[in-house]
From Swiss-Prot:
Membrane topology: Single-pass membrane protein
Lineage: Viruses, Varidnaviria, Bamfordvirae, Nucleocytoviricota, Pokkesviricetes
Annotated protein name in UniProt: EFC-associated protein OPG053
Source organism, top-level taxon: Viruses
Quaternary structure note: Component of the entry fusion complex (EFC) composed of OPG053, OPG076, OPG086, OPG094, OPG095, OPG099, OPG107, OPG143, OPG104, OPG147 and OPG155. Except for OPG095 and OPG052, each of the EFC proteins is required for assembly or stability of the complex.
Keyword DNA repair found: no
UniProt keywords, alphabetically: Disulfide bond, Late protein, Membrane, Transmembrane, Transmembrane helix, Viral envelope protein, Virion
Intravirion side: 197-212
Keyword Isomerase attached: no
Subcellular location: Virion membrane
PTM note: Disulfid bonds are oxidized in the cytoplasm by OPG088 protein.
């Protein structure tokens, strides 16, 4: 898989931004993880999985940083698509990132109903790349069941939108005409990743990696 070309989606840009924001805050991230990701399931093809522990004691901050990263990345999309994805996920683009979003409320309820104490299972949907290419899917465990739930929801939406190298190499440049070009290219390639599918029940189990 190391010899193939990497196939990137908006989720890759999102997770890079999220990791940068986590690193910028002088809050201990080496605390013992209260929550571990036990399994990652979904539809996988040519997909490499990486689990990164960035456990924080402040679950609210981790959720806020996640929303900030999401808003920044989807700014590359046309407004109609941007708002449609945000609504699907449960984030109000008119609110400040620190506001408690519908997504966060849903994830709080999810964690409470499922009584997640130690091990959490994530369903990330689809992770597929064309032949001769691979996708690197990074899952960041912040040690919060609520934040991990939010990440699960975001990856399902953003991992469907392919990012051509011309866009990746010029980020973060936000000239209006550039954004128009970005929007057109993104729309053209949105369905590229959705055309290649294969079902796999389990991709990762705590302490074990399976590559497809």
């Amino acid at each position: 898989m190391a010899e193939t070309k990497e196939f990137k989606t908006l989720y890759n840009l999102f997770i890079d931004s999220y990791l940068q924001k986590l690193a910028q805050h002088s809050i201990p991230t080496n605390v013992t993880c209260a929550i571990h990701i036990g399994e990652v399931i979904g539809q996988f093809k040519n997909c490499a999985l990486r689990i990164t522990n960035k456990c924080m004691s402040n679950s609210r901050l981790s959720f806020t940083l996640m929303v900030e990263s999401f808003i920044e990345v989807i700014s590359l999309l046309p407004e109609k698509d941007r708002r449609a994805i945000a609504e699907e996920i449960g984030i109000d683009l008119d609110d400040v990132p620190s506001a408690v979003s519908k997504l966060e409320k849903n994830c709080n309820a999810y964690a409470e109903v499922n009584n997640i104490i130690d091990i959490q299972k994530l369903d990330i949907g689809e992770c597929s790349a064309p032949p001769g290419q691979h996708m690197l899917l990074q899952i960041v465990n912040t040690g919060s069941a609520e934040a991990n739930c939010g990440l699960q929801t975001i990856v399902k939406s953003l991992n469907k939108i392919y990012v051509p190298p011309i866009i990746e190499n010029r980020l973060p440049y936000y000239d209006p005409w550039f954004l128009v070009g970005v929007a057109i290219i993104l729309v053209i390639f949105t369905v590229a990743i959705c055309s290649i599918r294969r079902n796999l029940a389990l991709k990762y189990r705590y302490g074990t990696f399976l590559y497809v």
